[in-house]
Amino acid sequence: MNRLKHYLLNMQSNTTTYREMYDGESILMFPNREPEVQYDPVYWHEDISCEISYTHKLAYSKPTLTWSIPVEKLGFDTVTSAAADYCLRAFIPYIDELNTGLYNRSRPDDENGKYYIHKPGGEVLVRNTAYFALRLQKDYINGSGNTVYLPDDDVSRPPKMCLCIRMQVQLPKGKLRKAIQMLCRDLPAAVDMFIARFDIVKFNQAIALSKKQADIRAWLQKSDYCAFIANGSILPRAKTTDLPLTGAIPFCSTPNGEIEVCGVRGMAIRRGVTVITGGGYSGKSTLLDAISAGIYDHCLGDGRELCITDASAMTISAEDGRSVKSVNISPFIKWLPGGDTRDFSTDHASGSTSQAANIMEAVDCGAKPLLID
C-alpha cells in the first residue's frame, strides 16, 4: 500500500476528487530500456491486492475497494457460492469493529469516515460482494514514491485463485491523514486479522451443509415431492428481521407424514394439491413462508437450513391495481365486460384478475409449485 500512501500524502488537503488514487499513475522502471508511465489502481499489501474504483461520478470520496485474497492463505480450495457466502459473513465482524472505532455521533459519515459492506440475510446467493476469481500476482517491486521496478528474474508468476471481497469506504473530507490511516493501516490490518483467525472448522461445516442441501434438491427432482422441511427447523422469524425467533418451538413432522431424505428426517410435501389448515396463530403462514423461502439455500444458524423447495416454486398473491398485458386468464375467468379473457390487458387489475394473471404468468415461466396464502 506504499504507492497508495504516496498518492494520498501528495494530494491537496481539501481535495474532493482523489484523482491520483483512482488513476494509479506510476513510473515503471525496466532493467534494459527506458522507463514508462503506466496506470494501475491495484495496490498490494504483501500478496493481497486491493483494486480501487469509482463508486459514482459524484462520489469521489467514497471509493469501491475489491480485496483479492489467495485462497491458499485461508487453507481451502473449495470455490463455490457457499464458500464465498461463508467468507463474507466471517469478514463482516472485522469491518464492524473498525466502524465501532470510528463512530462519532456528532459528525456525519462524510466528515468522520465509515466502512460499508453488504450484510446478507439468511439466503446463500451468488453475490458480487464475495466471489472467487483468478487474479494476477504482483510482478513488480516498489521503489520510492510512485516508482516501481520490474524484476529481472524470469520467474513465472501464474494467476492465483482468490477470494474477492468488495466493499466501499467513505473517506473523511479534508482529513487526508485519517484517510491514509483508514486505507493503508486499519483496513489491511483487518484483512490480516480475518486471515489469521479464519475458522476452517466452521467453513467445512458450511460446505458440508451446502452439499447436503444439494443432495436433497437432487432427490426432490427425482421424487414425487416438491418440498421438504427437516425436523428441528426453526421456522418463525423475529419481528422486523430475517433472524430466527428466539424461543421458537422447533418444527416436528407428524408421524404419518414423516420420511427420511438423505439421512435427515422431516416432512415432505407431495406434488399435487396440498391444503394447510389450522386455527388462528397456529403457524399456517409461517410454514408456507418457510416453504417459499426454501427455493434458496440458507446459512448455518438461520433455522431453515434444511427447508428445501423445488427451485421453480412461485408465491401467488392478489395485486390490486397492477398492470396486466396480453395474458390468457380464461381458465379462471370466462367473461369480463369489454375484454377478451383469452388476451386480457388492463392498467388497473382487480384482485381476482391480478391473481389469475399471476398464476398464468408463473406457469408460463415454468413454475411448478404454486404457493397461495
Name what the model sees in each region.
Residues V264-S292, Y296:
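Glycine-rich phosphate-binding P-loop
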Residues R166, A227-I229, P236, E258-E260, ...:
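Structured core elements
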Residues L245-M267, R322-D343:
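Active-site-adjacent "gating/activation" loops or surface patches in catalytic cores
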Residues A208-V261:
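Charged, amphipathic alpha-helical linker segments immediately N-terminal to NTP-binding catalytic cores
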Residues T309-D373:
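Switch/coupling sub-region of P-loop NTPases
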Residues M1-D224, L235:
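N-terminal accessory targeting/assembly segments
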